[in-house]
Amino acid sequence: SLTEQERAAQEAQRRKEAEARARELEERRRERALTARYPDKAAHDVERAAAIQLVDDVTATAEKRLVELTQQRKAFDVEMEFYKKDPSKAPMSLRRKIAENEESIAEQQRFIAGQDQEKRRVHQRFDVELAQLRKLWEAQRMPLPGATPASDAAAPAATR
């Protein structure tokens, strides 16, 4: 008969082992899902290209907006030429438009920088996945130790 402490220790050990088994099963499930989604490098490359294209499309839209804002700013600068000697005499509405334009330009630049970071994160995620997939693909190609190929196992049975 075990003491209360010993029973608690055994139960804790059993829980720990069960959690480890559950983690291992979850990891295997994730690996199977990954290899099912990406059966080869070409499939992985297609998915990477699609993810990068999404980021590039969003970036292109932001860059187009930045060009529009820059052109708008040039028009404001032409208007400001009339107040070159004393910019403080420029109408408040013009100064407000210039300030809003500058803020919009800065916002677009921050957004584009964020998209560049997102693109790096996407590449990094796919690089990590690819490293893991290479190991999994290699493991799929190599027979498990102790396992005999089906053709070898079937041959002796046919000769009996």
What are these regions (language model features)?
Residues 36-135, 139-142, 146:
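Surface-exposed, polar/charged faces of alpha-helical domains
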Residues 1-46:
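Short, cationic interaction patches enriched in Lys/Arg with P/S/T/G and frequent prolines
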Residues 1-15, 127, 133-160:
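Compositionally biased, proline/threonine/alanine/serine-rich low-complexity intrinsically disordered stretches
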